[in-house]
Amino acid sequence: MAAEPPALRLRPPGSTGDSPPVPRLLGGCVPLSHQVAGHMYGKDKVGILQHPDGTVLKQLQPPPRGPRELEFYTMVYAADCADAVLLELRKHLPKYYGVWSPPSAPNDVYLKLEDVTHKFNKPCIMDVKIGRKSYDPFASAEKIQQQVSKYPLMEEIGFLVLGMRVYHLHSDSYETQNQHYGRGLTKETLKEGVSKFFHNGFCLRKDAVAASIQKVEKILQWFENQKQLNFYASSLLFVYEGSSQPATTKSNDRTLAGRFLSKGALSDADVLECNNNFHLFSSPANGTSVGKSLSKAYSRHRKLYAKKHQSQTSLKVETLEQDNGWKSMSQEHLNGNVLSQLEKVFYHLPAGRQEIAEAEVRMIDFAHVFPSNTVDEGYVYGLKHLIAVLRSILDS
C-alpha cells in the first residue's frame, strides 16, 4: 500500500477560484467533479467521492464485486509483495492508500485511490472499457445477454468508449460525452469517434495521441508477459493536459510565442492550427492557406534542424531565411509583420521541443479480475486494436 498522499486543495481540476462552492458530504468529501463514467454519487446506490486530501474514494460494490476489487488492490499493494509481475503492474494503476469509512457510517467502505488528474490544470479525460467480453466467466445467461445487447460490437472491436471530457481552448469550457456516445460508434466511425477526445476545438492534439500510444503499449507489454490474471469489464483511464499553460514546470508554446511576439500581435481567437502542441496563428480574414503555409514552414524548420544541427543550439536566422519556402508564401494573406515574428518563434524552438504531451493512462475497475494460467487474450486483443486506432489517428 502506498504512503499517505500529500494534502491537496479540494477544487475540481480545471476550475477557477471563482467557482461556486461544492457541497460537502460525508466527512467533508464531495462528489468527484470530473468523473466521466461509472457509478455516479447521488444517481446510483454507490458512487465516487473526493476526499479533502485530494484522493478519490470509490465505494465498494455489493458482494462479490466489491470484495473482489478490494482483494485485488490488497494483493497488488501488499507491503511484503515480492511478485515481479504484480510489482510491475503497480506502475499502471492508481496508487492505493487503503480503505476509508466515514465516522458516521463505519459500515460504508471506500477504496482510497490516487486522483490521476490532480497534476493537470485542464485535464481531458476518457474512460475506455477493454476486452472482447464485458462479462466474466461466472456471469449468468441473463447477465451475458444484457452486456452483449449494450454493445454488440464489443467482441469484434475489443473496446468501448464509456465517456469523455475534453477541454476546448476557444470557449474555456469542457465538452462531455457519456456511455451512449461510445455505444453509437461503429467500425466505420470508430476512428473519428476516438479522435474527438484529442481535438481541442482548434486542432488535433497529436502530441497527446503519441503520448497515449506509448502508455498503452507499456500496458500491452505487461499483459503479453503475464499469465496470472484475467481482466473483464476493466477500463483504461486516459488523461492529458488540455491547457496551453500546464501546471508542470515545463515551458509551453504560448510562453514561447509570447517571448518573441510583440504584445497584441496575436489573440486567443487567432489560433488556427497546432502541430505537436505548437500553436499557429492567423487572422480570420486570412483563411486557412496561411495556417497551412506556416505549418509547412515549421515542418521545414524541424527538418533543417535535424539535418544540419546535432547539438542543442537553435537554428540561426540566416539559415532559414535562405530557404525559398518562406519566399513562396503568399504575402497578401499576412497581416503586417506576423510572418517575420513567427519566424523568430521557429528559430528559438529548443531541440526536442516537447514532442510528447503530459499524459497518463491507468488501468481502473477491478471487480471482475480472476486468477488464470493463460495470457489474457481478450484484453490483449482490445489493447492491440485500440493502439491501431490511435496510430491511425496519429498518421491521419
UniProtKB/Swiss-Prot annotation:
The gene is Ipmk. Pathway: Phospholipid metabolism; phosphatidylinositol metabolism. Binds two Mg(2+), but the interaction with the protein is mostly indirect. The lineage of its organism: Eukaryota, Metazoa, Chordata, Craniata, Vertebrata. This is Inositol polyphosphate multikinase. The modification Phosphoserine is found at residue 19. Keywords: Acetylation, ATP-binding, Kinase, Lipid metabolism, Magnesium, Metal-binding, Nucleotide-binding, Nucleus, Phospholipid metabolism, Phosphoprotein, Transferase. Gene3D superfamilies: Inositol polyphosphate kinase. Substrate binds at residues 65, 129, 143-150, 179. Inositol phosphate kinase with a broad substrate specificity. Phosphorylates inositol 1,4,5-trisphosphate (Ins(1,4,5)P3) first to inositol 1,3,4,5-tetrakisphosphate and then to inositol 1,3,4,5,6-pentakisphosphate (Ins(1,3,4,5,6)P5). Phosphorylates inositol 1,3,4,6-tetrakisphosphate (Ins(1,3,4,6)P4). Phosphorylates inositol 1,4,5,6-tetrakisphosphate (Ins(1,4,5,6)P4). Phosphorylates glycero-3-phospho-1D-myo-inositol 4,5-bisphosphate to glycero-3-phospho-1D-myo-inositol 3,4,5-trisphosphate. A motif (Nuclear localization signal) lies at residues 300-310. Its main location: nucleus. Highly expressed in kidney, and at lower levels in hippocampus, brain cortex, cerebellum, heart and lung. It comes from Rattus norvegicus. GO terms for cellular component: cytoplasm; nucleus. Its cofactor is Mg(2+). The keyword Zinc does not apply.
